[in-house]
């Protein structure tokens, strides 16, 4: 069986949590917990509440996501 592809969504950061985790509100109104991708950590990209971001979500767990891009 092939691996399911990630779902890409846009959202905005509501709150910064501990351990580089963020509470993010998606464009459709849902709220998810997201962490920063490895490349963003390597390049020290800072995120603040109010920033618009692109997220990748697994089709198996839609309550968690990975932040892959900051607009």
Curated annotation (Swiss-Prot):
Residues 1-71 form the S1-like domain. The keyword Transport does not apply. This is Translation initiation factor IF-1. The keyword Repressor does not apply. GO terms for cellular component: cytosol. Component of the 30S ribosomal translation pre-initiation complex which assembles on the 30S ribosome in the order IF-2 and IF-3, IF-1 and N-formylmethionyl-tRNA(fMet); mRNA recruitment can occur at any time during PIC assembly. PANTHER family: TRANSLATION INITIATION FACTOR IF-1, CHLOROPLASTIC. It comes from Flavobacterium johnsoniae (strain ATCC 17061 / DSM 2064 / JCM 8514 / BCRC 14874 / CCUG 350202 / NBRC 14942 / NCIMB 11054 / UW101). NCBIfam families: infA. It holds the Pfam family eIF-1a. One of its GO terms (molecular function) is ribosome binding. Keywords: Cytoplasm, Initiation factor, Protein biosynthesis, RNA-binding, rRNA-binding. InterPro entries: NA-bd_OB-fold, RNA-binding_domain_S1_IF1, TIF_IF1. SUPFAM superfamilies: Nucleic acid-binding proteins. It is found in: Cytoplasm. It comes from the Bacteria. One of the essential components for the initiation of protein synthesis. Stabilizes the binding of IF-2 and IF-3 on the 30S subunit to which N-formylmethionyl-tRNA(fMet) subsequently binds. Helps modulate mRNA selection, yielding the 30S pre-initiation complex (PIC). Upon addition of the 50S ribosomal subunit IF-1, IF-2 and IF-3 are released leaving the mature 70S translation initiation complex.
